[in-house]
Amino acid sequence: MFWFYQGVATYLGQTLGVETHITQSQYDPLQDPMMLQDQIDIAFICGLPFVQLNRIIPGQLQALVAPVMQASRYQNRPVYFSDIIVKASRNFRFEDLAGKTFCYNDPGSNSGYNLVRYRLMQSQYPSSFFGKVMQSGSHQRSIELVVEGIADCAAIDSTVLEQQLRFQPELANHLRVIESIGPCPMPPIIISSRLANDSQKLQSILCQPNTELASNSMKQAQIRRYVSVQTEDYAPILRMYDDVIQAGYGILG
């Protein structure tokens, strides 16, 4: 989706009459020096590191907008799911994944890791439920590992899975979603509190995009629209995170 983020950054720059620079961070969000030192104005970020950063640097960041995806499953709301996938030939239910190999993108991912921990905790399965747990580095790689049979299952951001199925429709013959965890607040665009006075203007620009952004980049990304969100909207993610940590589900496997 970096191509889409570039499109949004270009649109903001053109609309505001400023030069924009977008980079893909190589750091864990919780250790990103630019983020921690308030050197980033606007960021696209997963909901879990966002709420965690608000504990580390309280008041420095605030949620601005979040996308509403086009698919009917999102019910015209800024939400998404964690889709649990298995190989199409495997007749698994979630409970059948006990002792199997689970693949996730990153331990800081809400959809790839945190929601799975919460699902195990809610069902009173142990943190050692999976026989083997492996990190892939990305949702796309997790999908590949399941297709290749290296992993039995993976937790995938539903919007990423939909995007991959559009780009590679043949994947539908190799994968099956056995359960969807959620809905959960959609990853937001956030801003530094230094820009708080401009937040309404930025929200208006993104929630009422020009034809080029709406018809090209947003349509291709299957985004129906952007809506304004508040930092408080992401509190449920932090509560789930706190619950799994307190219950001893910090590390799976």
Language-model regions, residue ranges each:
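Bilobed "Venus flytrap"/periplasmic-binding protein-like clamshell domains
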Residues: 1-15, 25, 48, 76-143, ...
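An extracytoplasmic/periplasmic, membrane-proximal ligand-sensing/linker region
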Residues: 2-3, 7, 184, 191, ...
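A short beta-strand-loop structural module common to alpha/beta enzyme folds
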Residues: 19-27
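Short, hydrophobic alpha-helical packing/hinge segments within bilobed ligand-binding/sensory domains
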Residues: 30-34, 49-50, 141-145
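Acidic, polar ligand-binding/catalytic clefts
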Residues: 34-96
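A ligand-binding cleft/hinge motif common to bilobed small-molecule-binding domains
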Residues: 44-58, 121-122, 147, 152-172
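Short hydrophobic/aromatic-enriched beta-strand-loop microsegments
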Residues: 61-66, 129, 154, 174-177
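Periplasmic-binding protein-like
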Residues: 66-83, 169-204, 223-233
